[in-house]
């Protein structure tokens, strides 16, 4: 049978070649004409077309496949087919039964209908593997739909976890998230089907996590999470952290009342984080969305037109628009959302939330069977800030994961999400503040501030500053006393919260709760007990110095009650062993301990001889070792000591003159923080602002930390308060962890109030060192004392007396070792050890020190080691210099100071005397001096003015300085500078000529490569064709025949419609499909990137300098007469004879390079006079670099698709 002749082109493919195609991806051969070229090539009906010219076309429709084959340069194009089974597709539009039975031996080899060909002739079929994995992914998606069909939130979490795993490749996180989202009975089957999507390098870890029972542990941890919070170092977790508090305007509720339910009513229905969120892409093209919007902040969809793009995207009435193309739309007005939607492009992406979802309280969520599954749905809150905002090198989401446990992260994200709806600062502080209970966690406040408006930032800072800025109110003076009022402290700036210690876990006594719950008329009669470290709870509007019970915010009262209830159980047993000197108080009259009351401004304060910081109800402040503001700036005045019910202490100072203001003593106690630059800057700034009124004394050491006391003295001296502490305080303090305090250079330190000049300080009478204060606060009284020896020798508390005895000002017992301490005024400051403290010493070697009685002996021993002499910071007195025995010799200096200094250094490096250097210059021996030394001698040579001054110098040379003597001797050499330049030129000529020759050769070779590159010319032709196609229909109807080559650097600036790629990506993709041989065009241009770095002007200038130096040397050879001593003319003439041929060769190479460069510029249509070589070659170098990067992006995308990593969005 005769064979039909093969056509000359592919324009009639496939009919001209004797076969027909059908199908819509993949395509099948429907019919093959006998005797045609297709029949002769082995093509049979039913064959599936998989490849055309090596390109995978299994997913292309018939029209696209035909278009691709007709553009192939080879005639006919090579095809890769999958042989048909026993039957082929019929003449329908899609795959059908085959018309012919071919290749029956396959059945005998085990091939059956429906099998997928994965390997053909020893080669893997990536597209077949890809389809196999895609089918398994679809099966997995169907199983998820079957199990989680009624749980859309859990289903969304599963796919979000898979998408996150595809990006981060973390198996443990994947298993953790799936465990939280999936029911326990569904974990096993779904994880088995999920294993195929795990890369091989991670499957071992995946199997280990599943097989070794870690999955069961995660399930158990999830079930127990609602009942017991994870314990973190240095903080007691409180289960009520996640409970939603009442608003600031709500009245305080009793502890036995259940927490109220919150509801936030929006226009579109009830809003809440419980609504199911989903991401929707609307393919609208040039059409409208097809929905109507209502409301604002956020807007919601009122109605959707049937058949519209919104209806096709499954949007429905009641959906609220939260994000548009990644932009937050939740707080935008209606008009702004409409304008943003109009400019959102052809395929905008929306994040919507279903409407009509009840807003459940946090307590309900804790009792739900799957409380932690909401953590993944709240992940968008952690990722709302851009990754460019970082603190300590981490983003917001990274800091949340690094600092907080999963329940804590849930609480913070849930609080922020709720805040976005109600915008209530008080509720945000109450919800977030108990979680951020350590200095390390308080870094998160800097991120939270980024989510607030400027007004909300200022309000939040005022609220927190008032809430944290406790000032002990021991007395409020009567108006008739006419006392001098204290200035109001300035509010902290915005950045002051960045590093201040916010941990204020204080205990609120029953008196405070009673004062908050009482009516306005009862409050003046109810004294307010204070404990160390407690602050007045204000609403942010009243000053902390004058608390008003009518303006107390219930939000902060509730927060105080939370913190109070969380510590009663823990500290109850510890407080029983604490003994403190009781004192008289009108508030409480029974019990071994007396409560000191703080009266309201309308109440007269009862005088007392001494002042003690007392604990409420016998409870020790748990924050004594954790919370710490740097300074407690007490603005209240201490009342003068007057005779009271008890005897007057013998050591107390006499009462001051009633006509003068009562004396006071301000005590600033600083807990020694961890070593950091911020800490040092804080102390420096504080010392500068406080000036001479502050005295920094490293006075003593406690088992936990060292302190610095800063004390102010009035004319009347100071009052010292002491309290005996038991060993239980030290133990409880060490268990709580060391105080981590931070400061910032931007923190504002208010200056101290004006006071009379300080008199000579009074010595302390048997004063004990202050312990670590609760919240760093001090009233006029001295802080609690903790002797070192009480760690191992606790003092049992005395039995409670029937009536409180008088309080002595100085306890009779003194800790051993501390009694021998010098007075604080004469104590020498010592250097501090910059160590980092162990946060939790329990179970370590440091936790065992308290059990060893030898530690007390060591603590006493170090007091006698004279450490102050070795590490004292006081500078020794400088000895008075005696009279000079001889007057300094006066010298004459002519050189500038800089030149003289550098000349002295150079003489030390030369290792040549001036006479030897003169001999070198006269004999012109280049080997005796290095080129660098010659260049320095030229640089430091005298200028014309200095040469005239040397010539006018008529005195003895010995009166000159050493550099001037050297220069004076060098100037006696004829043509001193010319000789130096000649020697330097002779030493560096070879290096310069090689450098210039290489640059010129690079320009010449790069010009030739650009002119002769056919691949580059083909690419430019392809770009021209693409541009003319895009510009067709523009006002200029004539097609462009050429373009300026600088357009090549702008190809990546033209974006595609979806914004994901550029014109350069499309160019690279098209070349890889149609002209793959052109992809390596950069290999034809290896010299072009090097030529782009050559500066043509500098090159021309260097050549001109060489010619100028040679002319100068020639003139010097004629002017300097040769002699037996001076060999300049003879040496340099001989040198010029060998140097001039090399320069002539350079001149010829320069002419040739410039000629080739001009031809290349003209070849590409550029002006040779206006275009420099570096600009010309730089265009092509930049195009090559960008093209390689675009090609790498395409290949990386192809690699991900061929490796089977199917995105969950494609399912």
From Swiss-Prot:
Residues 226-269, 478-502, 525-549, 568-600, 618-672, 718-783 are annotated as: Disordered. InterPro entries: FH2_Formin (IPR015425), FH2_Formin_sf (IPR042201), Formin_Homology (IPR051425), PDZ (IPR001478), PDZ_sf (IPR036034). It is found in: Postsynaptic cell membrane. The modification Phosphoserine is found at residues 580, 621, 652, 655. This is Delphilin. Keywords: Cell membrane, Membrane, Phosphoprotein, Postsynaptic cell membrane, Repeat, Synapse. Interacts with C-terminus of the glutamate receptor GRID2 via PDZ domain. Residues 242-251, 618-639, 725-746, 770-781 have a biased composition (Low complexity).
């Amino acid at each position: 049978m005769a064979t039909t002749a093969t056509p000359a082109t592919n324009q009639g493919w496939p009919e001209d070649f004797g076969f027909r195609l059908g199908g819509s991806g993949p395509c099948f051969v429907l019919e093959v004409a006998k005797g045609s070229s297709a029949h002769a090539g082995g093509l049979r009906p039913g064959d599936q077309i998989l490849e055309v010219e090596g390109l995978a076309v299994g997913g292309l429709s018939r029209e696209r496949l035909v278009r691709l084959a007709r553009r192939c340069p080879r005639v006919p194009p090579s095809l890769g087919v999958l042989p048909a089974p026993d039957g082929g597709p019929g003449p329908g539009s899609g795959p059908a039964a085959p018309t012919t039975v071919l290749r029956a031996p396959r059945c005998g080899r085990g091939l059956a209908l429906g099998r997928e060909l994965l390997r053909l002739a020893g080669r893997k079929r990536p597209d077949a593997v890809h389809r196999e994995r895609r089918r398994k992914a679809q099966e997995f998606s169907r199983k998820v739909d079957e199990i989680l069909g009624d749980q859309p939130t859990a289903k969304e979490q599963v796919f979000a976890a898979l998408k996150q795993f595809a990006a981060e490749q973390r198996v443990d996180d994947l298993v953790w998230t799936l465990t939280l989202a999936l029911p326990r009975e569904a974990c096993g089957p779904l994880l088995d089907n999920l294993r195929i999507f795990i890369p091989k390098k991670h499957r071992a870890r995946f199997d280990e996590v599943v097989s070794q029972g870690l999955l069961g542990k995660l399930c158990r941890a999830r079930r127990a999470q609602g009942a017991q919070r994870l314990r973190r170092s240095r903080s007691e977790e409180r289960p009520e952290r996640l409970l939603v508090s009442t608003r600031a305007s709500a009245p305080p509720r009793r502890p036995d009342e259940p927490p109220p339910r919150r509801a936030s009513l929006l226009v579109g229905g009830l809003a809440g984080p419980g609504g199911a969120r989903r991401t929707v892409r609307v393919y609208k093209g040039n059409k409208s969305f097809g929905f109507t919007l209502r409301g604002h902040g956020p807007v919601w969809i009122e109605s959707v037109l049937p058949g519209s793009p919104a209806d096709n995207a499954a949007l429905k009435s009641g959906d609220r628009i939260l994000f548009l193309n990644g932009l937050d739309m939740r707080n935008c007005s209606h008009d702004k959302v409409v304008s943003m939607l109009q400019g959102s492009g052809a395929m905008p992406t929306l994040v919507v939330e279903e409407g009509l979802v009840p807003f459940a309280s946090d307590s309900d969520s804790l009792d739900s069977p799957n409380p932690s599954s909401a953590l993944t749905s709240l992940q968008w809150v952690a990722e709302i800030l851009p990754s460019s905002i970082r603190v300590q090198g981490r983003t917001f989401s990274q800091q949340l994961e690094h600092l907080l446990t999963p329940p804590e992260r849930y609480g913070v994200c849930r609080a922020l999400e709720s805040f976005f709806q109600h915008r209530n600062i008080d509720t945000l502080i109450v919800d977030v503040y108990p979680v951020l209970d350590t200095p390390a966690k308080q870094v998160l406040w800097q991120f939270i501030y980024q989510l607030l408006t400027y007004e909300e930032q200022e309000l939040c800072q005022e609220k927190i500053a008032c809430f944290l800025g406790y000032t002990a109110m021991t007395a409020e003076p009567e108006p008739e006393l006419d006392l001098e009022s204290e200035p109001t402290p300035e509010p902290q700036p915005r950045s002051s919260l960045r590093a201040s210690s916010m941990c204020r876990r204080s205990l609120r006594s029953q008196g405070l709760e009673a004062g908050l719950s009482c009516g306005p008329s009862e409050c003046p009669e109810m004294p307010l007990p204070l404990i160390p470290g407690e602050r007045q709870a204000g609403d942010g509007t009243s000053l902390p110095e004058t608390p008003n019970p009518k303006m107390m915010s219930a939000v902060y009262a509730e927060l105080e009650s939370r913190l109070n209830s969380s510590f009663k159980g823990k500290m109850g047993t510890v407080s029983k062993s604490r003994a403190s000197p009781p004192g008289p108080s009108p508030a409480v009259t029974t019990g071994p301990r007396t409560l000191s009351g703080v009266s309201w401004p309308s109440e007269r304060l009862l005088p007392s001889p001494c002042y003690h910081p007392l604990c409420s109800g016998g409870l020790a402040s748990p924050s004594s070792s954790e919370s710490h503001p740097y300074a407690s700036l007490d603005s209240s005045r201490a009342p003068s000591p007057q005779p009271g019910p008890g005897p007057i202490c013998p050591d107390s100072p006499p009462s001051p003159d009633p006509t003068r203001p009562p004396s006071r003593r301000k005590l600033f106690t600083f807990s020694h923080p961890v070593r950091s630059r911020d800490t040092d800057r804080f102390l420096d700034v504080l010392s500068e602002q406080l000036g001479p009124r502050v005295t920094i004394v490293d006075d003593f050491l406690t088992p936990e930390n060292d302190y610095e006391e800063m004390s102010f003295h009035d004319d009347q001296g100071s009052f010292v308060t002491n309290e005996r502490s038991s060993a239980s305080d030290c133990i409880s303090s060490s268990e709580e962890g060391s105080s981590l305090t931070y400061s910032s250079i931007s923190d504002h330190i208010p200056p101290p109030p004006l006071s009379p000049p300080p008199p000579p300080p009074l010595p302390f009478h048997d004063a004990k060192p202050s312990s670590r204060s609760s919240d760093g606060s001090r009233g006029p009284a001295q802080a609690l004392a903790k002797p070192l020896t009480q760690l191992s020798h606790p003092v049992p508390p005395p039995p409670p007396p029937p009536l409180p005895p008088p309080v002595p000002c100085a306890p009779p017992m003194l800790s051993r070792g501390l009694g021998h301490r010098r007075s604080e005024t004469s104590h020498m400051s010592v250097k501090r050890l910059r160590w980092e403290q162990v946060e939790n010493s329990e179970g370590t070697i440091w936790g065992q020190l308290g059990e060893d009685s030898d530690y007390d002996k060591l603590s006493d021993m170090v007091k006698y080691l004279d450490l102050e002499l070795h590490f004292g910071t006081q500078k020794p007195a400088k000895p008075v210099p005696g009279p000079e025995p001889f007057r300094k010799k006066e010298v004459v200096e002519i050189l500038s100071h800089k030149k003289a200094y550098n000349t002295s250094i150079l003489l030390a490096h030369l290792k040549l005397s001036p006479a030897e250097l003169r001999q070198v210059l006269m004999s012109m021996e280049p080997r005796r001096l290095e080129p660098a030394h010659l260049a320095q001698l030229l640089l430091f040579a005298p200028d014309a003015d200095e040469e005239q001054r040397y010539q006018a110098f008529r005195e003895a040379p010995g009166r000159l300085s050493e550099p001037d003597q050297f220069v004076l001797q060098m100037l006696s050499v004829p043509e001193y500078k010319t000789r130096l330049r000649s020697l330097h030129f002779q030493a560096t000529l070879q290096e310069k000529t090689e450098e210039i020759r290489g640059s010129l050769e690079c320009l010449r070779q790069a010009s030739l490569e650009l002119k002769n590159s056919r691949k580059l010319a083909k690419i430019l032709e392809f770009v021209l064709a693409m541009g003319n196609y895009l510009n067709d229909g523009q006002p200029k109807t004539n097609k462009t025949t050429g373009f300026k080559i600088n357009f090549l650097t702008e190809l990546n600036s033209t974006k595609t419609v979806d914004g994901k790629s550029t014109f350069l990506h499309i160019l690279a993709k098209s070349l890889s499909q149609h002209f793959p041989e052109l992809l390596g065009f950069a290999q034809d241009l290896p010299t072009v990137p090097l030529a782009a770095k050559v500066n043509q002007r500098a090159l021309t200038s260097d050549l001109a300098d060489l010619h100028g130096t040679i002319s100068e040397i020639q003139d010097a050879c004629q002017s300097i007469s040769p002699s037996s001593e001076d060999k300049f003319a003879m040496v340099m003439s001989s040198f010029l004879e060998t140097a001039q041929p090399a320069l002539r060769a350079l001149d010829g190479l320069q002419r040739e390079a410039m000629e080739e460069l001009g031809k290349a510029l003209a070849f590409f249509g550029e002006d040779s006079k206006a275009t420099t070589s570096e600009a010309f070659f730089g265009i092509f170098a930049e195009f090559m670099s960008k093209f390689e990067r675009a090609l790498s992006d395409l290949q990386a995308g192809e690699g991900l698709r061929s490796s089977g990593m199917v995105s969950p969005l494609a399912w």
